[in-house]
Swiss-Prot record:
Role noted for this protein: This protein is involved in the repair of mismatches in DNA. It is possible that it carries out the mismatch recognition step. This protein has a weak ATPase activity.
Molecular function terms, GO-annotated: ATP binding; ATP-dependent DNA damage sensor activity; damaged DNA binding; mismatched DNA binding
One GO term (biological process): mismatch repair
Any single Pfam family the record assigns to this protein: MutS_III
Gene: mutS
CDD domains: ABC_MutS1
InterPro entries: DNA_mismatch_repair_MutS, DNA_mismatch_repair_MutS-lik_N, DNA_mismatch_repair_MutS/MSH, DNA_mismatch_repair_MutS_C, DNA_mismatch_repair_MutS_clamp, DNA_mismatch_repair_MutS_core, DNA_mismatch_repair_MutS_N, DNA_mismatch_repair_MutS_sf
Assigned keywords, A-Z: ATP-binding, DNA damage, DNA repair, DNA-binding, Nucleotide-binding
SUPFAM superfamilies: DNA repair protein MutS, domain I (SSF55271), DNA repair protein MutS, domain II (SSF53150), DNA repair protein MutS, domain III (SSF48334), P-loop containing nucleoside triphosphate hydrolases (SSF52540)
Record organism: Bacillus cereus (strain ATCC 14579 / DSM 31 / CCUG 7414 / JCM 2152 / NBRC 15305 / NCIMB 9373 / NCTC 2599 / NRRL B-3711)
Name of protein: DNA mismatch repair protein MutS
Amino acid sequence: MIQQYLKVKADYQDAFLFFRLGDFYEMFFEDAVKAAHELEITLTSRDGGSSERIPMCGVPYHAAKNYIEQLVEKGYKVAVCEQVEDPKTAKGVVRREVVQLITPGTMMEGRTIDEKENNFLAALTHFEDGSYALACNDLTTGQNTVTLLTGSVEDILLEVYATGSKEIVVDSSFSKDELNKLTETLKMTISYEDATAIPEGLEHLVKNVSQAKLIKAVGRLFNYVIRTQKRSLDHLQPVEIYYTNQFMKIDVHSKRNLELTETLRTKEKTGSLLWLLDKTKTAMGGRMLKQWMERPLIQKERIEERLEMVETFVNDYFLREDLKEKLKEVYDLERLAGKVAFGNVNARDLLQLRRSLLQVPAILEAISLLDNAYASRLIQGADPCESLTELLGRSIQENPPLSIKDGDIIKDGYNDKLDQYRYVSKNGKTWIAELEKRERDITGIKSLKIGYNRIFGYYIEVTKANLAALPEGRYERKQTLANAERFITDELKEKETLILEAEEKIVQLEYDLFTALREEVKVFIPKLQHLAKVISELDVLQSFATVSEEEQFVKLVLTTKREIFIKDGRHPVVEKVLNGKLYVPNDCIMPEKMDVFLITGPNMSGKSTYMRQLALVTVMSQIGCFVPATEAVLPVFDQIFTRIGAADDLISGQSTFMVEMLEAKNAIANASERSLILFDEIGRGTSTYDGMALAQAIIEHIHDQIGAKTLFSTHYHELTVLEESLDQLKNVHVSAIEENGKVVFLHKIQDGAADKSYGIHVAQLAELPDSLIARAKEVLAQLEGQEEIIIPKRVEVKVQEAAPEPVVVKEEIAEIQETKVETEEESQLSFFGGEQSSKKQDKPLLDQKETAVLAQIKKIDLLDMTPLEAMNELYRLQKKLKKG
């Protein structure tokens, strides 16, 4: 048996092998040691025929599902090896085969599968010209997609990340460096498949795919699925081709910064835009909503179609509420179809399918009555599958058991033979009850009873006290107990045979009838999948209508002009979280000839919220939802770029400033005049003058070369003078007022630049020490009153022994003030200088390497460089200094 195990294990080295032995799945050797640790189960051992014992652990077969889910949830694979012949009739070792390989990307059900999220398996194929093809499959729904990608490896990885896949399939020669990024950066399970030809029998799924590259990626994906699942895949849907330029592009960093589907802090749905908009009533509607949010539209006509449909639902309360009530009764048709194809559907699943289908005719009829071309096109070709509803209605019991092997699944009247067996079983038991009464009357023994157990079958039981009353020769002794004797008669044995045969045949026949019924349902899978898409889309549209009415959103107007007009706009999620507290709305009005808003104002005043607000309004508009405003006119944006908040962890090993520059580069390189750019305090990760210079250069480049609608917030108040030289830039600020020495943030956007930053007031709100606040105010007053370097005030620090107060020599002050510095390093203001800063230094301020770098900096002509060239030069010089 161990030899058999090792032979099977050789083909599944990267998976736990669940090896069926009787009522247990056993694991041996390294699998056992690792599984015992991961599953927290007992590790034992068995004799292996040598001096060392074989490590071993096992789980009961009826509880295996839970243990398999635990392992897969941790990123492992599990190969399930079953006994494929009856041990009673087997000659020698029972024949065993792996019947399924369960992986993170091929899980069909379990707690790891969120009902409102897809579980995609990805396959990535790299070509010699540098391009990639990415194919994805959700085995639970049968959905298949494929796209062609170009760009850097990081761009490809981010697109893979956007699919939400937990497992990715590549060929065995795939770059090890890229694999490391997949495992370390994206935490994905890696699998291998070299076959790329479309498997026999699945050619019809790629009829609309003509590009050889795309077919190779799909072929790799399908071959892996077939190899791991080893069963029917009748529910796989035709492959959908998508191109990234068909949708608004939002890179993963921006999606995370905007918290579209999950929050930055908790990585959970609650608190995201998806959380707010999700009023769907079906699981499949929830999945479609998330897909829409991942890929907003850029076709004006399609967006307007959705908006008109949402408006119809908003204006017709009774239609919307009636639709919602019916949708509540619709189960997950996509995943039910998948279970039918996989052969793991049970009677309760089919009952759910029937209950869902009962709602469909009324839903389709209500939508057909609407005077709306989009609605008519949506339901065109949708089949309510009434014949399937009728079939399930007359075949499946109303309260069937979970197991399909326990009987009591099929209704009376569905099958004549089954009805006959049930009649024999039912009447046989009635006959036994009558026999018991008759025997009591004949013998006069009132305590006589007829019973049944699995070992002895039916019997007549008489207590020992009443044995003398039994007629001679009437009964045949069968079993002796302490206080009773059990007997049988020829008549009872005959009936027992009929009853037991009938009950055994009932269970087997019901199982056979159910499996045949399942095959009949398979025929309807394509119709069920089409129906699922129709119902999902209606569900998302009613969800938009429901949230729009509840939150008082308005239908926007899409314009072909490059103008933004938002009156009383709100951040939808912040407003919801405030839960009735006063939210301050803000306008965002950018005419066609106005491209850049330079936003100033104190921290905590709402600059970032205002910027995110515009982005979320834009996303909502382009998925077809009403928006949080009293009036809105928007163009269709092709891309959104954001740099808001702290550094992302997707690109590891880079400083905050470097990540900031890389994201700025991404926007500058890819944005068009139809894009939206949101930059929050660009340049803050380096020194003041470097940051200010870069911020100004970036603003000028966007203004002069790109022309994208841009919100650029900054604490560099010196930049506000750009309004005088850049005719399509406008200063705006978030207002605040001082009352009794305290700052009050009004959260209102107003024209013009901010007059103060109120940073010290924010520090007061954070409850920094009073002495520190007082010192900060003193330094601020000095800074605002002069341009020369401030000599830090000496603060006496008490330790074990009071240190003498440092003496500042007048000649030293004069020397410092007379020194005219041009470099960034020497012009930085020192607020907290130590004793050494008041003394003459014995060694030069700059070493030889630093002097050389300084000389290079002096020669740089920033006005003759592009922002990207400036960033590259800065990065090069910084690396040169760090090497020392």
